[in-house]
């Protein structure tokens, strides 16, 4: 099974400690529970940074990494105590006794005692690393501990003089995926690909968009991915021109396209695939003409992405393909170079070509100005060109209301890239063949 080992979490914690100053502590807080309505909560989703260092999926938890000097450090987890009554109602808790063995931390303390314990752990240190402003409850806990230290000089207490945000360091770490992470992302891609394939096979005119949403989520669940990594987009007809359309409530009509942007979350990591296909299984000529431009853009990107390139550089090649294609169809008019200089493509391709992918679907990490950061092995990103012709656009009528995006997930390797989501078809003739075959079953 693809998952992150205890040893991997320990390596990550050690890697952060090595970047900390001597005489310091890093505090990483779990996400709080979020109320849905009245006394009902949303399904709990752990803070991605906390998960990155622990793999622990309970609220009311804090990881403390203490670096005394360059050779001495230790880890402390504050977490909820075992409580028979609470566990009958709401599920099992790990508790303090099992945490060191399960999670690989040095010791565990009760979260209910954090106000009595945290200031003692911080006493005498010079620096505290804390993501101030992320969670109000976390700021209250940290500020309370520091205030106790500042007021305790007569008891030989001293507070850290410096607070540093650990997020820039941690998010740079998260940008480069380990082999274990890539294996999990590969599985997330496989499950997501199977769900998109299922949607193509099940699609029929007269169904509603939410029917395909249900088929997709069913396939996620069948393979151990309980939740989507973001709100599923199923946009048929003109809805495909709305980038983050999530109502998913319209009837899918014969002759329309349907754009599906959906990904599963597997072991905390996100899949993210988009496919666009005809509701009736057969592209019209106008749909195919737009689709071919987007597909060429994707295939060119997949050839170009490798170490030493950048999102900015590859985007430039994609824009040229798009503008040239739109000129040939009469959607744009003029010289290709002049149109590119004028950003004439922006009304039809208004989002970025790629974003980082990992524990978050829009994962953390610096892109550089205009996404000019040079790509390196271990980076994982999406490739998602799209063209969206608004229903009221002043273009030839047959193209109005067509929205097409095609998206794959890749990891940059030493020699190029690996497509993590190649197993779901995207060539028009392959899509049509798949949908025709499904209708015969």
Curated annotation (Swiss-Prot):
Pfam families: AMP_N, Peptidase_M24. Binds 2 manganese ions per subunit. InterPro entries: Aminopep_P_N, Creatin/AminoP/Spt16_N, Creatinase/aminopeptidase-like, Pept_M24, Pept_M24_MAP, Peptidase_M24B_aminopep-P_CS, X-Pro_dipept-like. It is an enzyme of class 3 (hydrolase). Mn(2+) 2 binds at residues 261, 272, 407. It is found in: Cytoplasm. Its cofactor is Mn(2+). It catalyses: Release of any N-terminal amino acid, including proline, that is linked to proline, even from a dipeptide or tripeptide. Gene3D superfamilies: Creatinase/methionine aminopeptidase superfamily, Creatinase/prolidase N-terminal domain. GO terms for biological process: protein homotetramerization; proteolysis. CDD domains: Prolidase. PROSITE patterns: PROLINE_PEPTIDASE. The keyword Protein biosynthesis does not apply. The keyword Ribonucleoprotein does not apply. Coiled coil: none annotated. Keywords: Aminopeptidase, Cytoplasm, Hydrolase, Manganese, Metal-binding, Metalloprotease, Protease. Mn(2+) 1 binds at residues 272, 355, 384, 407. GO terms for molecular function: aminopeptidase activity; identical protein binding; manganese ion binding; metalloaminopeptidase activity; metalloexopeptidase activity. One of its GO terms (cellular component) is protein-containing complex. SUPFAM superfamilies: Creatinase/aminopeptidase (SSF55920), Creatinase/prolidase N-terminal domain (SSF53092). Its EC number is 3.4.11.9. Belongs to the peptidase M24B family. Homotetramer. This is Xaa-Pro aminopeptidase. It comes from Escherichia coli (strain K12). The gene is pepP.
């Amino acid at each position: 099974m693809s998952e992150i080992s205890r040893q991997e979490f320990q390596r990550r914690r050690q890697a952060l400690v090595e970047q900390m100053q001597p005489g310091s502590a890093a505090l990483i807080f779990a996400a709080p529970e979020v109320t849905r309505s009245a006394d009902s909560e949303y399904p709990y989703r752990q803070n991605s940074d906390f998960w990155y260092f622990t793999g622990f999926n309970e609220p009311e938890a804090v990881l403390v990494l203490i670096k005394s000097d360059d050779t001495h450090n230790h880890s402390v987890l504050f977490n909820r105590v075992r409580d028979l009554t609470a566990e009958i109602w709401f599920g099992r808790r790990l508790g303090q006794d099992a945490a060191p063995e399960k999670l690989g931390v040095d010791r565990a303390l009760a979260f209910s005692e954090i106000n009595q314990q945290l200031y003692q752990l911080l006493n005498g240190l010079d620096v505290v690393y804390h993501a101030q402003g992320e969670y109000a409850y976390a700021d209250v806990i940290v500020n309370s501990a520091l205030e106790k230290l500042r007021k305790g000089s007569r008891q030989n207490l001293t507070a850290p003089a410096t607070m540093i945000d650990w997020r820039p360091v941690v998010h740079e770490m998260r940008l480069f995926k380990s082999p274990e992470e890539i294996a999990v992302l590969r599985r997330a891609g496989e499950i997501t690909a199977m769900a998109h394939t299922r949607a193509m096979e099940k699609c029929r005119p007269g169904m509603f968009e939410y029917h395909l949403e249900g088929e997709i989520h069913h396939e996620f669940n069948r393979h151990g991915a309980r939740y989507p990594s973001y709100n599923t987009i199923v946009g048929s007809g003109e809805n495909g021109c709305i980038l983050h359309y999530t109502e998913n409530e319209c009837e899918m009509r014969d002759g329309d396209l349907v754009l599906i942007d959906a990904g599963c979350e597997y072991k905390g990591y996100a899949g993210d695939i988009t496919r666009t296909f005809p509701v009736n299984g057969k592209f019209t000529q106008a749909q195919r003409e737009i689709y071919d431009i987007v597909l060429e853009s994707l295939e060119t990107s997949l050839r170009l992405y490798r170490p030493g390139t950048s999102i900015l550089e590859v985007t430039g090649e994609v824009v040229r393909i798009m503008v040239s294609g739109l000129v040939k169809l009469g959607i744009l008019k003029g010289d290709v170079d002049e149109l590119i200089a004028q950003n004439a493509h922006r009304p039809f391709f208004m989002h970025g070509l790629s974003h980082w992918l990992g524990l978050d679907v829009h994962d953390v990490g610096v892109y550089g100005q205009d996404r000019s950061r040079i790509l390196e092995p271990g980076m994982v990103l999406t490739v998602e060109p799209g063209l969206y012709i608004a229903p009221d656009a002043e273009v030839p009528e047959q193209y109005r209301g067509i929205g097409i995006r095609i998206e794959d997930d890749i990891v940059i390797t030493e020699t190029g890239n690996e497509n993590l989501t190649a197993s779901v078809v995207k060539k028009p003739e392959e899509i049509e063949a798949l949908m025709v075959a499904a209708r015969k079953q």
